[in-house]
Structures are given as C-alpha cells and as structure tokens.
Amino acid sequence: MAIGSKIIKPGGSDPDDFEKSIAQALVELEANSDLKPYLRDLHITRAREIEFGSKKAVIIYVPIPQQKVFQKIQIILVRELEKKFSGKHVVVIGERKILPKPTRKARNPLKQKRPRSRTLTAVYDAILEDLVFPAEIVGKRIRVKLDGSQLVKVHLDKNQQTTIEHKVDTFTSVYKKLTGRDVTFEFPDNYLNV
C-alpha cells in the first residue's frame, strides 16, 4: 500500500515529511489491525503539529465526506496513533473552507448565496464539535468582556468526563491556535435527572 493513497492534498501539492509520517502510520495500522475494512478507502488531506507549553498535539485533517466513517473508528484510531507518536495528543478535524463575507461594493458579486456551512461562525462551531468528539456539547455560554473580547464556555457531556478530561488543555490550545478564540471546557452536573 502506497503512502500517496493515504494523503491527498487539495491542489495536488506534495506532502511534507510530517504528513508522510502520519500517512505511513495509517498504512501500518491498515496492514496490522482490525481497522482494515474501514481504513482501506479513507485518506487525509493534511496534518499539523502544534506546541503548547511543553506538550505537542497532532492535528489531522480529513475530507468532510469521509468524516462520518472516521468518527466510527476515531476512538481506536486516535489511541493507536497516540501510541505511535509517543503520547502526543491526536485530534481529527474535518477540512472546511470559509468563504469571505460578501460586501456591497464587490467587483464580481457571488453568483450564488454563500451557504451557512461556509460561514466563519459555522466553521468555528464545527471545529469545536470535531475537537471534543466523541463527547457531545450540551451547552455553550459566550461571555463578552468590557474590552470586547469573548470567552466561550463550552459545557460537555458529564458521561464522557473520564474519557476526555485529560485532553481538555489540548482542546483549548488547539482551538485557540486554529481560530484565535479563547475557550474553556466544563462538565456541569445534569440538572434534569429524569
């Protein structure tokens, strides 16, 4: 199995060494594990490594049409990749595009209306959903400070606290790096005990 089939970059550009190492890890996982039927048709679009404090995180971008299949195997896949990359936290995010806001005096007006899924807000919300997967976002509070800066408090499902609590700092720093927005994650108690 060739590494080139596991990473297909938009625009046909060549992957760098780090992206090749991720693709190689995916090829090895496909050859040796029970993930083979899932990984056979899947590929990634790009990968990045970011540093925060003394730790590092790996961000893997996947095509949106394949994201649902990636999410089926994400828990096992992330665990195996974290073993291969010596404990670095691995995050899988969908490859999304933000279209600019149309202006009134645009030289070449858009031929069709900008879809909601391509707006900045929708893309940033989707990145947040992808980051915390498999946990579910159950609530969100946006606090606007007097200087105009925003602090987003994201409430996550209490049932998933044990599985992702150790990654909350990673999620915060990755989201800050990708979007420039501050976010804090909380696990509030369920008020509606039915």
From Swiss-Prot:
Keyword list, A-Z: Ribonucleoprotein, Ribosomal protein
GO CC annotation terms, alphabetical: 90S preribosome; cytosolic small ribosomal subunit; small-subunit processome
InterPro entries registered for this protein in UniProt: Ribosomal_eS7, Ribosomal_eS7_CS
GO terms, biological process: ribosomal small subunit biogenesis; rRNA processing; translation
A single MF term (Gene Ontology): structural constituent of ribosome
PROSITE patterns: RIBOSOMAL_S7E (PS00948)
Family membership noted in the UniProt record: Belongs to the eukaryotic ribosomal protein eS7 family.
Protein name, per record: Small ribosomal subunit protein eS7
Species for this entry: Drosophila yakuba
Lineage, broadest ranks: Eukaryota, Metazoa, Ecdysozoa, Arthropoda, Hexapoda
The encoding gene: RpS7
